[in-house]
């Protein structure tokens, strides 16, 4: 029984790893994460700062949110995004460090 529950745990964990990896597999999403590492921003601000259309930025943000990397909150007509956890900043920083060294 313990082996079965351990297998379920590992399957869920590696499934989440894969979802995160897929979400990070796009350069625009990585840039959006870097912008959000500097603080909460609206979709409009993120689109402007990243050079994306509003629709394209929204699609990328949705993928990051579905992977659990960012969270959103609504403020009237505006949606603001932020990193879901400080560990997301560490992940982003680690990826940047590895990329700069390679």
Q: Which residues fall in each region the model found?
A:
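Short alpha-helical linear motifs
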Residues: 56-60, 99
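N-terminal helix-turn-helix DNA-binding core of bacterial DNA-binding proteins
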Residues: 15-55, 74-87
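Alpha-helical residues within the helix-turn-helix
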Residues: 48, 59, 65-66
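A generic alpha-helix structural signal
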Residues: 18-21, 61, 92
């Amino acid at each position: 029984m313990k082996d079965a529950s351990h297998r379920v745990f590992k399957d869920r964990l590696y499934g989440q790893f894969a979802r995160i990896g897929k979400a990070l597999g796009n350069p625009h999403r990585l840039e959006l994460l870097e912008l959000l590492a500097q603080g909460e921003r609206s979709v409009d601000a993120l689109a402007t700062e990243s050079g994306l259309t509003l629709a394209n930025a929204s699609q990328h943000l949705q993928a990051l949110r579905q992977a659990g990397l960012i969270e959103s909150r609504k403020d009237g007509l505006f949606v603001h995004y932020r990193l879901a956890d400080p560990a997301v900043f560490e992940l982003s920083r680690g990826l940047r460090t590895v990329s700069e060294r390679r």
